[in-house]
Design a protein with these regions (language model features):
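Short S/T/G/P-rich N-terminal loop/turn motif that feeds into the first structured element of a domain
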Residues: 1-47, 53-87
Length: 87
């Protein structure tokens, strides 16, 4: 498994969380190879961990992330990493 890890700066927390629940979560969950996803926030910093069953699927999503981000956040980085353990 591989994880896509986007990090964002949030400019409007309420609007960003609404967009996340209504657009991002349904969108990523329909992506080929999707396994699960978690999104977290601390103050105006957001972090996602979107798990895919293959590196190819994760890389494909990492290339789509920038086009999915609303104007209420700034995309700071996107990484693809191998998942080495889970429980």
């Amino acid at each position: 498994m591989h994880a896509v890890i986007p990090q964002v700066t949030i400019h409007d927390i309420e609007a960003a969380e609404s967009y996340l629940r209504e657009q991002i979560v349904p969108g990523v969950s329909q992506a080929p190879g999707f396994v699960t996803a978690y999104f977290a926030r601390k103050e105006n910093s957001g972090l996602g961990m979107i798990i895919f069953d293959s590196e190819d699927a994760a890389r494909a999503m990492s290339e789509r992330i920038a086009s999915m981000v609303p104007g209420t956040v700034t995309l700071d980085s996107v990484e693809v990493r191998e998942v080495v353990a889970n429980s």
